[in-house]
Amino acid sequence: MKKTLMLLAMVVALVILPFFINHGGEYGGSDGEAESQIQAIEPQYKPWFQPLYEPASGEIESLLFTLQGSLGAAVIFYILGYCKGKQRRDDRA
């Protein structure tokens, strides 16, 4: 029980601490930062690829990004659970 509470406190600290460390800071995406750095280094650079789908707003883009991450996590944890269940079944046999 003590170990669980300690781990939970560490997770909460990791979630909340960045907001206090970077108080008033801007949380921007890495795509925009990369684009500005490329333009600073090579102003004539033209992207060689365009997105297949451009979301209508930033909120929809965030939603799609979150769904993509959730789906990836679901697949990973399904595979881990399947392997664990298979291992338990083999141990019983």
From Swiss-Prot:
Main location: membrane
GO cellular component, one term: plasma membrane
Pathway: Cofactor biosynthesis; adenosylcobalamin biosynthesis
Intrachain disulfide bonds: none
Recorded topology in the membrane: Multi-pass membrane protein
InterPro entries with a match to the protein in the record: CbiN
Transmembrane segments: 5-25, 63-83
Assigned keywords, A-Z: Cell inner membrane, Cell membrane, Cobalamin biosynthesis, Cobalt, Cobalt transport, Ion transport, Membrane, Transmembrane, Transmembrane helix, Transport
Protein name per Swiss-Prot or TrEMBL: Cobalt transport protein CbiN
